[in-house]
């Protein structure tokens, strides 16, 4: 059976079209090109739902060669664009390779009047390494060398992942590759209440509150590095609706194997609450929420802690009963004390 020349030419044209990665059909994204981006999710919270779009206003990505751990690229995005549906950081121009990627989110915040809360290491592409990447909480260093913080903190988030960026030498990896980066929140709001057992109104000016922990320096993997102890002071104090008083703190990451120590002192110098571990107290109610979590997962998910202490007629807390996030807690031992 003979074939006409025109039939053969038509067959060749069709084959060429199929080999062109559907560029005729998908003119905006030829499938013979590999493209890559990074998307983000923050569902590591007590809602167990993604709240990235409403909570994060800046992201900084560091891409390290997986073998040498040398920094190969940095990407930064900030502003209202992060609230867009399916926001992603485009990796166009990133060299092909296998990468360990670290994300710090919330460091850059130009939209409000708060000073910067955190500073990232000064990193140089081509020479800096993964182990040099740190995030440091800003603090006041006083003349005696002690470190203090009484500021509200911008919400800080951290995440890590691994990814491969494909180049022209991987024709079987064409198309779009999107990597999802899960975030954990590193900042916490702590609300401390003192409630009068006698019904007599307490004076907000009569109490001094501190939380002490050396947790202001975070490594690339979100672990705590050795740091000076930071004395946190409330950014706000006031009265409660009843006869009590309250103080609000922002503190950096809480760790299950460490203690952040709360002390409340009255005007006479008497310790109302003396060196109590709020970390241990917070974990007393972990199992009340109906989710299976280990201690560190709970501390990473729960970013808001309320501790209510009843002050007796002698002006101190008994050390036996308190409320944690509205749950009544009866203490059977002194394990919460450092």
Q: Where are the regions a protein language model picked out?
A:
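Short, hydrophobic/proline-enriched secondary-structure or compact coil segments at domain edges
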Residues: 36-42, 191, 259-266, 322
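Tryptophan-paired
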Residues: 60-115, 202-287, 338
């Amino acid at each position: 059976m003979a074939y006409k020349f025109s039939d053969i030419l038509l067959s060749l044209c069709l084959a060429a079209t199929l080999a062109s990665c559907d560029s005729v059909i998908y003119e905006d994204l030829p499938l013979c090109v590999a493209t890559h981006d990074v998307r983000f999710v923050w569902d590591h919270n007590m809602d167990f739902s993604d709240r990235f779009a409403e909570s994060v206003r800046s992201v900084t990505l560091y891409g390290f060669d997986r073998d040498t751990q040398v920094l190969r690229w940095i990407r930064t995005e900030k502003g209202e664009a992060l609230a867009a549906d399916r926001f992603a950081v485009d990796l166009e121009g990133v060299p092909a390779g296998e990468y360990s990627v670290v994300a710090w989110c919330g460091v850059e915040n130009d939209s409000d009047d708060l000073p910067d809360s955190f500073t990232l290491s000064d990193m140089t592409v081509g020479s800096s390494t993964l182990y040099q990447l740190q995030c440091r909480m800003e603090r006041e260093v006083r003349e005696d060398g002690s470190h203090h913080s009484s500021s509200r903190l911008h919400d800080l988030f951290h995440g890590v992942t691994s990814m491969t960026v494909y180049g022209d030498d991987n024709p079987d990896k064409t198309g779009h590759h999107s990597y999802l980066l899960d975030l954990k929140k590193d900042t916490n709001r702590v609300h401390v209440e003192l409630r009068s057992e006698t019904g007599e109104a307490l004076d907000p000016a009569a109490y001094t509150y501190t939380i002490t922990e050396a947790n202001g320096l975070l490594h690339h993997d979100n672990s705590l590095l050795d740091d000076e102890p930071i004395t946190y002071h409330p950014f706000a104090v006031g009265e409660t609706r009843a006869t009590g008083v309250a103080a609000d703190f922002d503190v950096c990451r809480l760790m299950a194997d460490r203690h952040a120590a709360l002390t409340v002192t009255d005007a006479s110098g008497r310790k109302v609450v003396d060196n109590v571990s709020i970390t241990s107290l917070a974990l007393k109610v972990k199992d009340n929420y109906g989710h299976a979590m280990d201690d560190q997962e709970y501390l990473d998910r729960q970013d808001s802690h309320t501790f209510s202490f009843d002050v007796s007629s002698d002006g101190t807390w008994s050390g036996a009963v308190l409320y944690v996030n509205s749950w009544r807690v009866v203490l059977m031992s002194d394990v919460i004390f450092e």
